[in-house]
Amino acid sequence: MAETGAPLIRLRGVGREYPSGEGVLRVLTDIDLDIGQGEFVAVMGASGSGKSTLMNILGCLDRPSSGSYRMDGREVARLGAGELAALRRETFGFIFQRYHLLSEMTALGNVEVPAIYRGLPADARRARARDLLERLGLGDRTGHRPGQLSGGQQQRVSIARALVNDARVILADEPTGALDSRSGDEVLGILERLNAEGRTVVIVTHDPRVAARAHRVVEIADGRIVADRRTGAPAADPGPGPAQAPQPAPQPAPVQAPVQARVQARAAVPVLGRLAEALRMALLSMRAHKLRSFLTMLGIIIGIASVVSVVALGEGSRRQVLQNIAGLGTNTLQIFPGRDFGDMRSGRVTTLVTADAAALARQPHVASVSPTVGTSATLRHGATEASAQISGVGEQYFDVAGVALTQGRGFDEADVAAMGQNVVIDENTRTSLFGDGPALGQVFMAGKVPLRVIGVAEAQNRGPGGSTSLTVYAPYTTVQARYLGSTSVSGLTLRVADDVDMALAEQMVADILTRRHGTRDFFIVNNDQIRQTITSTTQTLALLIAAIAVISLVVGGIGVMNIMLVSVTERIGEIGLRMAVGARRGDIRAQFLIEAVLVCVIGGIAGILAALGFGLAFERMSSDFTLVYSPLSMLAALASACAIGLAFGYLPAVNAAKLDPVKALQKG
């Protein structure tokens, strides 16, 4: 607590020095100064005398290298960064020679900034800021940006900003230095009225005429106080006038509350509310630098679009491959004569016969079996001729191989037993022979054998570009007797029961046929193994391409970090101003971190839209292949964008939060 009768501000033996080469530069030496509540003090000195450094120490923007500074009885040197921010936010109001207004914000928005960090509700602080501007004669300029205001108007905006938190102490650094004489007199008149209301006003100036308006002048030269005198200036009449400052509005902390209580008191500032304000300010910054923001997020757009498109491409490829393999049947084994594909002696192997199919069909692990034989023939219908593959199969083949019928029916056991001439043709054959006309019931010649159409099956093995081969499915007995003149078959297609392991079933089939033939003169193709191998290969390729796309995403993140680091340098003055009006280091860090995340999220959304656009264009160019987009991959892409914003925005945000407010204001 403050000592009874103690001054509001007390400095004893305060010195400030900076490293300079191998030595130090002493700017202030043994400063002893007391300033009471309600005083109007001018600190006057030539350029380089140390007066601005003294003001920075008074306003807790800088720390003394030596000595003691007590504010309302509390030692300032013992305050942490957060407590100093609270002191600047709740006790001091700063007026700068160069105004330090944020160019992307309106006059009203600039005045609101300190109240944002104090945690006032949006409606309350907006009403407070508007009232201040109206009382300072800027009621019709609340929506103007700094570039649309004169110097005097900008300085009045900065005065309103200093008052929005009902500051007890006004610190003005050369407040009239950049103004004409009339505007300067208006500003000094406002400061006099503020002092008349009971506020402590400290002006830093080099102009004796400005200093003469104060009640007390402290002269400083070469870092030392050389004079401290009263001027005898009369107190200002706080009567009505266009430049009259507003009466203090009720605030969370009373005007006369001691600093210790004000620093320790913490307003109930909802975290979400502060984050919402940081988000709003980030949007304002992005809108003020549209091209830079777009170029920053361009790398993210490309990276996210690449990742989403590659995932969609991989899923589309996987489904296309599985669709093609589905033509081979589900849970199927195919048995062929010979040692393997390309066996020169396979044509002389005649031991694979229909009796093998019957033997396998009796096994409990086998759902169905169909012998297969094949030949080719020329089809004729009217004046139309076409070459086709004649596939001799059993009545169960369509179920075994998963061939779907689009019209009619398949042949039955009676057709197989009677070597009947009822056949099923595929869609390609139907189109080739009959065009758009009816196919069911039509008779055509296959070589010298007349065949009647009883069903139409979907075309098989449709990959990119489609298949143009013609296929006729006939009873295998018909093909053996009427085309081949042999009882052997070219293969067996077997469907395994759903609850049986494919590898075990393959081994059991091999054992049965080996016993029947006396040797292993056949080989087995496990379609599920092919499916798994191709699916695994497709996924591996998709992961490889996705890894390349992720690299582009990381490069985009590095670009975000680079631009944000540049942004910190460009906006160093803004950072200093925000700290001066009470922003915590966490507030600065959150603002830049949210800005980085926002850039990445907007870039991520744009990247997803770009990927969807690419998919539509791709479908127009290739109707046989479709990119399959996954909502999960899109959510993962947005999550990745957020993570990249957090990861690559952290360093710039930390750098911004570590800035010294004095150095930031000087460089800005």
Swiss-Prot record:
Leading EC class: translocase
Pfam families: ABC_tran, FtsX, MacB_PCD
EC annotation from Swiss-Prot or TrEMBL: 7.6.2.-
Entry superkingdom: Bacteria
SUPFAM superfamilies found in the cross-reference section: P-loop containing nucleoside triphosphate hydrolases
Subcellular location as annotated: Cell inner membrane
Protein name, as recorded: Macrolide export ATP-binding/permease protein MacB 1/2
Organism: Paracoccus denitrificans (strain Pd 1222)
Classification lineage: Bacteria, Pseudomonadati, Pseudomonadota, Alphaproteobacteria, Rhodobacterales
